[in-house]
Amino acid sequence: MIAAPLDAVADSKGRKPFYSHLYVQVLAAIAAGILLGHFYPELGTQLKPLGDAFIKLVKMVIAPVIFLTVATGIAGMSDLKKVGRVAGKAMLYFLTFSTLALVIGMIVANVVQPGAGMNIDPASLDPKAVATFADKAHEQSIVGFLTNIIPTTIVGAFADGDILQVLFFSVLFGIALAMVGEKGEQVVNFLNALTAPVFKLVAILMKAAPIGAFGAMAFTIGKYGVGSIANLAMLIGTFYITSLLFVFIVLGAVARYNGFSIVALLRYIKEELLLVLGTSSSEAALPGLMNKMEKAGCKRSVVGLVIPTGYSFNLDGTNIYMTLAALFIAQATGINLSWGDQILLLLVAMLSSKGAAGITGAGFITLAATLSVVPSVPVAGMALILGIDRFMSECRALTNLVGNAVATIVVARWENELDTAQLARALGGQTEEGAPAGGLQPAE
């Protein structure tokens, strides 16, 4: 059995004090980090190791969490064809909503035009500022990305912490365990027993989340300053509002159609959302999200396949950002893109968003990869948004996280691998008597 999250078990003598909840501590740490970074920027920049150390601690356990969840989930399947069905349905969902996110970003950019009137001469931009990102973008390709999913060695996949490589091996190992039947029971029992201490370790590491969030936020504000936000407030505001509308309207409609409330889901994963907000890293929340989705009634086999894959292929926030930022650069530099140019941009973004997935700074590097193929928009124009990308990355990561949580529940429901009563209890949507109370409606 997977260990409960930090605040899942209430004190036997009564409810725990509000300040003992992880999400309250992380929220307070974020606020403290903002204040320290603003008033003492030099000290704030020196606290970067706190955030980096916490993210490394979490990444340390991501590989074993994925392996144990996927391998034991698939090993327990009676029908191995279901593995292919789950993966196929997940990829169909990812493709549909990733494309929709790209289109929404493009439409919003054309309607709001956040870069209009800036009149920046492209020749005045310094291409050296974004040279590193452009070089990394050129190193990425669809073929290279797909072949890189196969690890050179099993140990190498775990040592590097490559999510897709670990997932690839875990799926194959789980299938092998299922095929050997009784001969593999001892291995399955061992892996199931190992799951509890691994997730207990995750819970222990999460106690350091407030420290990591404090250090990361103090560094961000200390280095970039609140002033950098004000300079490009139109773009930042447009992106944040668009992402919010995407979550509450688009994903909200998907959630409602599938029998649950997006607001209740956000409340349920609030700790993971605040963790992402504080660290700007969606990977920091991956173990906790997998744990909570299983506790919400999604079968382990679905959780293990959908969430790690979604971290590379279901990047709704990143996709909104890509088309919105690309058109912002064009508008700011006075470049008028025809609808043909914009469709080309959309098609290239659909491919490059997959080829650059799973790498550090994926959003910015993916944008560089897209612009390098579309000659109308100068790659050097990315220098305009380099200073605010850190603030944009938080919104990208938050939207990506919510998108993957919704995707997991939807795919589980499609496969009849969702315990709707358990989901209702997890989201707080049922009374003690078990009757629906608004958080979850019966699925049609």
UniProtKB/Swiss-Prot annotation:
The lineage of its organism: Bacteria, Pseudomonadati, Pseudomonadota, Alphaproteobacteria, Hyphomicrobiales. It comes from Rhizobium etli (strain CIAT 652). PANTHER family: AEROBIC C4-DICARBOXYLATE TRANSPORT PROTEIN (PTHR42865:SF1), PROTON/GLUTAMATE-ASPARTATE SYMPORTER (PTHR42865). Responsible for the transport of dicarboxylates such as succinate, fumarate, and malate from the periplasm across the membrane. Belongs to the dicarboxylate/amino acid:cation symporter (DAACS) (TC 2.A.23) family. This is C4-dicarboxylate transport protein. Coiled coil: none annotated. The keyword Ribonucleoprotein does not apply. GO terms for cellular component: plasma membrane. InterPro entries: C4_dicarb_transport, Na-dicarboxylate_symporter, Na-dicarboxylate_symporter_CS, Na:dicarbo_symporter_sf. It is a multi-pass membrane protein. GO terms for biological process: L-aspartate transmembrane transport.
